[in-house]
Amino acid sequence: MGKKDKRWVMQRKNDFYYKLAKQNHYRSRASYKLLQLNEKFEIIYEGDNVVDLGCAPGGWLQASYDLVGEDGFVIGVDLQKVKPLREENIVAIQGDMTKKETINKIIDLMPSKADVVICDASPNISGVWEVDHSRSIELSLMALIATTHLLRKNGNFVVKVFQGSLFDQYVQLLTKYFKKVQTTKPKASRSVSAEVYVIGKKFLGKKFDKNTDFPIIKLIEDNEFLDRYIEETHEKKEGNETSDNDEDNNKNGLMIKKIKELRGKRSKL
C-alpha cells in the first residue's frame, strides 16, 4: 500500500461519520446523508414503500428501514450483489436499473407503487472532472427514467448529482416532473466532494419523454464536454512542446487516449 493509500485509510478511519456508522452498524457513512436529508425535507415517512436505485453496499437501505419501520417496505437494486439484510421487509436484488426487465421485477416484488425513490449511485470515476460530471448526469437521467415507472403520483425522489456544467439543466428538467424541486448538500457529505442532492417533491405522474427532454440528452450524447477537454488538452500539450517537461506531455497524451476510449464505451440512453 502506497503512502497516498495509507493516508486515505487513516483519514477514513478518523472520519466522524465513518466511526458513527460503525458504532450504529450501518454499512456506510452515507446512511447519515439520507437521515439528514429526511430530517430537513421530510421525504420518507413511516409505512412508506421505498425503492433504492444503486443500493450497494446497503447503507441507504438500512437508513430507509429505520425511517419506514416494520409497516413499510424497502427494495434496492444494484449491478453488484448486495449482502442480504436480516429485516424481512428489506429486499435487495441484483440487476440493471436501465433494463425493462429489472423495473418489472421491482414492480412485481413491491406491495404497491413506491412512495419514494432514492438514488445515491455514483458512476465509475475516471479522474477527469467533465467526464465524471457527464457520467453522473447520465446516471441521474437513468434514475429519473426508472422513477417515472416506479413512483406513485405525489411521491418523492432523491438523487445524487455531481456539480458541473449540466447541473442546472438537470434540476430544471426535474421541474417538469415534480411540483417542487430543491437542492442541498448534507453535513455528512465531505466538503471536498462535488456531490449535491436533488429532491423532487410531489411527482406529477408523467412518463419520461425523450423527445420533449431531448436538449439535455443531446448534450450528453454529443460528448460536448469530452470534445472541449480534448481540445484544451491539445492546446496545453502544444504549449509545452518547447519545455523539458516530457512527463507532462506524456500524461496529456495518455489522458486524451483514455477519454477517447471512455467515449467509445459509453452507452446511449
From Swiss-Prot:
Assigned EC number: 2.1.1.166
A GO term from the CC aspect: cytoplasm
Catalytic activity reported: uridine(2552) in 23S rRNA + S-adenosyl-L-methionine = 2'-O-methyluridine(2552) in 23S rRNA + S-adenosyl-L-homocysteine + H(+)
Residues annotated to bind S-adenosyl-L-methionine: 58, 60, 78, 96, 120
Annotated keywords: Cytoplasm, Methyltransferase, rRNA processing, S-adenosyl-L-methionine, Transferase
UniProt keyword annotation of Disulfide bond present: no
Location in or out of the cell: Cytoplasm
Enzyme class: transferase
Chief localisation class: cytoplasm
Location of the region described as Disordered in the Swiss-Prot/TrEMBL record: 234-269
Positions annotated as active site in the UniProt record: 160
Family: Belongs to the class I-like SAM-binding methyltransferase superfamily. RNA methyltransferase RlmE family.
Free-text function comment from the UniProt entry: Specifically methylates the uridine in position 2552 of 23S rRNA at the 2'-O position of the ribose in the fully assembled 50S ribosomal subunit.
Designated name of the protein: Ribosomal RNA large subunit methyltransferase E
Taxonomic path: Archaea, Methanobacteriati, Methanobacteriota, Methanomada group, Methanococci
Gene, per the UniProt record: rlmE
